[in-house]
Swiss-Prot record:
<feature type="active site" description="Proton donor/acceptor">
    <location>
        <position position="137"/>
    </location>
</feature>
<feature type="binding site">
    <location>
        <position position="208"/>
    </location>
    <ligand>
        <name>pyruvate</name>
    </ligand>
</feature>
<feature type="active site" description="Schiff-base intermediate with substrate">
    <location>
        <position position="166"/>
    </location>
</feature>
<protein>
    <recommendedName>
        <fullName>4-hydroxy-tetrahydrodipicolinate synthase</fullName>
        <ecNumber>4.3.3.7</ecNumber>
    </recommendedName>
</protein>
<dbReference type="GO" id="GO:0019877">
    <property type="term" value="P:diaminopimelate biosynthetic process"/>
</dbReference>
<dbReference type="GO" id="GO:0009089">
    <property type="term" value="P:lysine biosynthetic process via diaminopimelate"/>
</dbReference>
<comment type="similarity">
    <text>Belongs to the DapA family.</text>
</comment>
<dbReference type="InterPro" id="IPR013785">
    <property type="entry name" value="Aldolase_TIM"/>
</dbReference>
<keyword id="KW-0457">Lysine biosynthesis</keyword>
<dbReference type="InterPro" id="IPR002220">
    <property type="entry name" value="DapA-like"/>
</dbReference>
<comment type="subunit">
    <text>Homotetramer; dimer of dimers.</text>
</comment>
<comment type="function">
    <text>Catalyzes the condensation of (S)-aspartate-beta-semialdehyde [(S)-ASA] and pyruvate to 4-hydroxy-tetrahydrodipicolinate (HTPA).</text>
</comment>
<keyword id="KW-0704">Schiff base</keyword>
<dbReference type="InterPro" id="IPR020625">
    <property type="entry name" value="Schiff_base-form_aldolases_AS"/>
</dbReference>
<dbReference type="GO" id="GO:0005829">
    <property type="term" value="C:cytosol"/>
</dbReference>
<keyword id="KW-0220">Diaminopimelate biosynthesis</keyword>
<dbReference type="InterPro" id="IPR005263">
    <property type="entry name" value="DapA"/>
</dbReference>
Length: 296
């Protein structure tokens, strides 16, 4: 049995806003309690799903403090703290640690399209700036370039606090290389709900999930079933919720999941530009699936 620190079901938490665009801290606390009661293993605010590009440094710090306060010792609090400017990424990481984050999710620099050595040096500076664990976030669909398995493994071997990767490349050759060649302490997490089952079958450690915002017990149940070797149970869960996993990306994340949560009475349907509400047709599709699953 592995003792890896980063594993299980992690929710990539939405950031609830009020109609005036301010952060709804009361709703944020409700969300944390929802996940505490559901048994979520790790809660992760201020990531992509949390609309981090539109949060100020001060808002991010206050969100992390609020989540940590409400979570207590019931689950680990990781936090998104990355950007494409290394100096700013270091600043955000230090701020997150100071605010109470117990791990940092650091996205690969986007837009700049650095070389593999550039990626290495970026994450080296981040890792050396904090004492908490670092989760490298590799998401080529948003960053327009891939952090190679070789670079990720080099970082994992060179820095004791580089403890995980959120791998959202859907490149199974890369995923298998990471799983097969990693240090024992290093976790490989998927960032794609729709790939949880095959990912775990290959030896992955868990998921950093969008769908866990809506169905945390379901996501944890699937991951736990795969860890226990209960393939048929996991397949049944995946079959039932596969459409929801897909509909969460019918529009740009987190627009669909936030709309779903608004129907579930958890948050207001409020975003910060440039994100806008879904089309009426997509809303109807999502609502119908939530009704089908008995979530509303």
């Amino acid at each position: 049995m592995s003792n890896r620190l980063i594993s299980g079901s992690t929710v990539a938490l939405v950031t609830p806003f009020k109609e005036d665009g301010s952060v709804d801290y009361e709703a944020l606390r409700r969300l944390v309690r929802f996940h505490r009661e559901a048994g979520t293993d790790i809660i992760l605010p201020c990531g992509t799903t949390g609309e981090s590009p539109t949060l100020t440094n001060e808002e991010e710090a206050e969100i992390i403090r609020t989540v940590r306060d409400e979570a207590g010792d019931s689950m680990m609090v990781a936090a998104g703290a990355g950007t494409n400017d290394t100096r700013h990424a270091v600043e955000l990481s230090r701020n997150a640690e100071k605010a109470g984050a117990q791990a940092i999710l650091s996205v690969a620099p986007y837009y700049n399209k650095p070389s593999q050595e550039g990626y290495y040096q970026h994450f080296r500076h981040v890792a050396e700036s904090v004492s908490v664990p670092i989760i490298i976030y590799n998401v080529p669909g948003r960053t327009a370039s891939n952090v190679s398995a070789e670079t990720i493994l080099r970082l994992a071997h060179d820095f004791d606090n580089v403890l995980a990767v959120k791998e959202a490349s859907a490149n199974f050759e890369q995923i298998m290389t990471l799983i097969d060649e990693r240090p024992e302490r290093f976790s490989v997490m998927t960032g794609e709900d729709g790939l949880m089952l095959p990912f775990m079958a290959l030896g992955g450690d868990g998921v950093i999930s969008v769908a866990a915002n809506q169905v945390p017990k379901v996501v944890k149940g699937l991951i736990d079933a795969m860890k226990a070797g209960n393939l048929e149970e996991a397949r049944a869960i995946n079959r039932k919720y596969r459409k929801l996993f897909r509909l969460n990306f019918i529009d740009s994340n987190p627009v669909p999941v936030k709309y779903a949560l608004s129907l579930m009475g958890m948050v207001e349907e409020a975003y910060r530009l440039p994100l806008v509400p879904m089309s009426d047709a997509d809303k109807a599709t999502m609502k119908a699936e939530l009704e089908q699953l008995g979530l509303i």
